[in-house]
């Protein structure tokens, strides 16, 4: 897609956000007053449109590649609305995630719950964000033949994501800091459920449903996208430690938070006894000296090179899987996704 076309689609996409926001603050199911309307407006503007919007825009891109031609205004609106549903879902997860992780910044600004007038009201805001998704689906898709499948899809992916978050939280239980619990297979399970389904499978599944496809016939597409999601999360883990905070928009805290990160799992695999001891003694501690010791082990083990090797291998494997797919349109969708994340810096 030419860059001017994608800029045009992005501006249309952003306009749809305003329409959906207006629908929600005028929802007939609730009697809004000025205060509640202003709160919702501020909360939405702060949390929903601030990211890269990759997930949301991917629905529009994917639908366009499946259709193979220009989209009507109605198709642009509907695919954008589905894209925004994913961005809403993402906002709901992040608002609550930041509270659970006691994070400080998100997308280059303070986390929503860190704002003086917000605090724990953010927990209810997260619930509201989650409840906005079915409101949007009902208003704009209720008459569509794929409506029930859409509702099912969002419910299932939300369940998978929340369950992935649970494995992440109980594996990283503070007070039970036991690095020996961490392995590549646990890392993979967390990633698959917590990130891959909603970030990678969901946008393409939305486009496929809108295009009239049966998701049961696209299991292979799901598998490739889950693999892509795993690769994406490994990049994220890498950038948390090695990325520049001003570029990635947040200060990485995976080491302090005792996260089951790809880096620590790889380090444990490659480390000698002394390095393992250093990791066991310092991983998950908040003080800068401990964090520095963990990073020193990462540098000594040359995890940057190990990651680059992983990135190259993953890319090759993904391209091979994609090119095995019988449909050129589906191949284009998957390649477009991979192109967006390969060698990303943020």
Curated annotation (Swiss-Prot):
GO terms for biological process: farnesyl diphosphate biosynthetic process; geranyl diphosphate biosynthetic process. Dimethylallyl diphosphate binds at residues 106, 194-195, 233, 250, 259. Its cofactor is Mg(2+); Mn(2+). GO terms for molecular function: (2E,6E)-farnesyl diphosphate synthase activity; dimethylallyltranstransferase activity; metal ion binding. Optimum temperature is 40 degrees Celsius. Isopentenyl diphosphate binds at residues 52, 55, 90, 107. SUPFAM superfamilies: Terpenoid synthases. It comes from the Eukaryota. Mg(2+) 2 binds at residues 97, 101. InterPro entries: FPS1-like, Isoprenoid_synthase_dom_sf, Polyprenyl_synt, Polyprenyl_synt_CS. Mg(2+) 1 binds at residues 97, 101. It holds the Pfam family polyprenyl_synt. Coiled coil: none annotated. Binds Mg(2+) or Mn(2+). Maximal rates of activity with 1 to 4 mM Mg(2+) and only one third of activity with Mn(2+). No activity with Zn(2+) or Ca(2+). One of its GO terms (cellular component) is cytoplasm. Belongs to the FPP/GGPP synthase family. This is Farnesyl diphosphate synthase 1. It comes from Artemisia spiciformis. The gene is FDS-1.
